[in-house]
Swiss-Prot record:
This is Carbamoyl phosphate synthase small chain. The keyword Mitochondrion does not apply. Residues 172-363 form the Glutamine amidotransferase type-1 domain. NCBIfam families: CPSaseIIsmall (TIGR01368), PRK12838.1 (NF009475). GO terms for molecular function: ATP binding; carbamoyl-phosphate synthase (glutamine-hydrolyzing) activity; glutaminase activity. Gene3D superfamilies: 3.40.50.880, Carbamoyl-phosphate synthase small subunit, N-terminal domain. The active site is at residues 247, 336, 338.
Amino acid sequence: MYGILVLEDGTIIRGDGFGAETEVLGELVFNTSMTGYVEILTDPSYKGQIVTMTYPLEGNYGVEKEWFESDGIKAEGFVVKDMTGLKLDEFLKEYNIPGISGVDTRYITRKIRSKGVIRSLLKTSTNPITKDEETELIKKVVEYPDISEIDLVPEVSTKETVVYSADDEKTKCVLIDCGVKQSIVNCLVERGCSVIKVPYNSKKEEILSYTPDFVLVSNGPGDPENMAETVDTVKNLIGTLPVTGICLGHQIITIALGGKTYKLKFGHRGGNQPVKDIESGKVYITSQNHGFATDDCVVPTGSELMHMNLNDDTVEGIRKIESEDLKNTVWSVQYHPEAGPGPHDARFLFDEMVELGIKFKAEKAN
């Protein structure tokens, strides 16, 4: 099958198509992980994006449902140097997702690093793609909106409340689902925290009706500036019970506290991002997947920076300056402590969330 990747600047990259025979548009990004293609493809945060893998060989260890981070592939397309094994090809076909292999992924990655993330089109076809078709495809890419103009969260958030019960429940949280990864839910449930997953646009009254011990705002795709409903809910929740966040949830909390976010040139996507804990000086290798960040020049009033990225000094965590009253506790991280894929250096943060919930539960009982 023929494959073609068309970039907004008119660049045409031809290769071998695999997966579904179709055509998709999206923001072209790169991921530096050496493993974890199943988790990456099924991560809801990749909605609206075509993912290029910098590691050259993909598909060599198959596909298993237990590795899924959602109910199916959420990335729009997949770009690899070499694809091996039928399972990856069949996996993409099952979810009607195109892939292209046999292309210079180093060239693509350098281009993204130099120019920034790029609007692109990926087309696969059993018939050769003509020069006349190329012209039409370039036109489609140029007319495609920037990802910040697309409201992606409604496409990946749960439509109804879902409960994940811990066998030995120690605490309970409401998870505001902006496109949560299953690994996040698993990390909480394994630690004795029951999780009530609610839609991104749930209101304060509904959330409090579940009597949670804390709230977690999840990861997800797109620009946090599009999340006005969720931001308002988080504003109203702060001061009522502890609030935490991961990735997009971190950005939403930043805005809710009065801070600002901005779009990164090419984002952080991979399993090898070094993050420094400012207070302790410890460094953790983290898994990341984001294209927006907290503006360190507009730190929310009454808050402080918690973690920083050692590669580019961007903000990786903030917290509201601590109060003796647990209901005022607010903290969030930009990276993914659950990994999936990636190192587990930061999974202790789920222990801290659960401990926070247990303490607040006890405080409420007194």
